[in-house]
Amino acid sequence: XXIENEXEIVDMHNALRRAVRPTASNMLQM
């Protein structure tokens, strides 16, 4: 359980990173 929860947290961080990367590249282009 605990391990599964950690995996879910990692997925959340990965999803957030993927969502942030395009915005960061856009900021650099600006």
Curated annotation (Swiss-Prot):
Keywords: Calcium channel impairing toxin, Disulfide bond, Ion channel impairing toxin, Neurotoxin, Secreted, Toxin. Contains 8 disulfide bonds. Its main location: secreted. One of its GO terms (cellular component) is extracellular region. It comes from the Eukaryota. InterPro entries: CAP_sf. One of its GO terms (molecular function) is calcium channel regulator activity. Expressed by the venom gland. It is found in: Secreted. The keyword Secreted applies. Belongs to the CRISP family. Blocks contraction of smooth muscle elicited by high potassium-induced depolarization, but does not block caffeine-stimulated contraction. May target voltage-gated calcium channels on smooth muscle. This is Cysteine-rich venom protein ascarin. It comes from Aspidelaps scutatus.
